[in-house]
Amino acid sequence: MAGNQNQTGEQSVNETERYLELTPKSRAIWEEAKNYLPGGDSRNSIFWEPYPFFVESSSGCHVIDADGVDRVDFINTMTTMILGHAPKVVMQAVEEQLAKGVAYNAPNEHQVRLAKILCQRIPSFDLLRFTNSGTEATLNTLRAARAFTGKSRFAKAEGGYHGTHDSVTVSLRVNPDQAGDADRPNALPSSAGLPDGVVE
């Protein structure tokens, strides 16, 4: 058993060294980014040690980083890119829409058409609301659930990422020594600055 642990540790060190060799430009960008962005990025959910690679371009299931390393993307923007990166049909539709305007402070028919398609295809959808992010979606969902049930508490998947608002920034990456019992895990704040009642 100890031999396997040593082997795994050595493999991890070798992989980290290889990563450092392949990504010097990403590291330089990250070092500069830390001067302007907390932690070097606007999204702490996509940070990993020792630093993230910075994407230069993407196509299909591939992303190319600032150092020219071509990687197969198994995350696909947390599974939102179901057609892959930069599919021609989507790029063409986006270009056509951009020519008509970038953003409006008013509704447009496209959202009605998409909402209708989704409600017709998903039987449990009576009505829906589009959001800008998963964080906004879970924040609004919890607010609606509290209003509907009159209850303030809810269950959250241990170790699961559900956005970055206060209510769900709990137990994202938990050290096994702090996790507690598997049947009743400890709720641990994943960030400083959370209100006292969040982890109760």
Where do the model's predicted regions map?
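N-terminal acidic, proline/glycine-rich, low-complexity intrinsically disordered segments
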Residues: 1-6
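Active-site-adjacent loop/helix segments that line or gate small-molecule/cofactor pockets in enzymes
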Residues: 9-57, 197
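Electropositive phosphate-/nucleotide-binding environments in soluble metabolic enzymes
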Residues: 23-27, 57, 84, 88, ...
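Short, hydrophobic/aliphatic alpha-helical segments
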Residues: 24-32, 62-69, 119-120
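Active-site and channel-lining beta-strand-loop segments
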Residues: 52-75
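Short, well-ordered beta-strand elements within core beta-sheets of diverse protein domains
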Residues: 59, 80-83, 199-200
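Glycine-rich loop-to-alpha-helix module at the N-terminal edge of alpha/beta enzyme cores
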Residues: 70-151
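PLP-dependent aspartate aminotransferase-fold enzymes
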Residues: 116-200
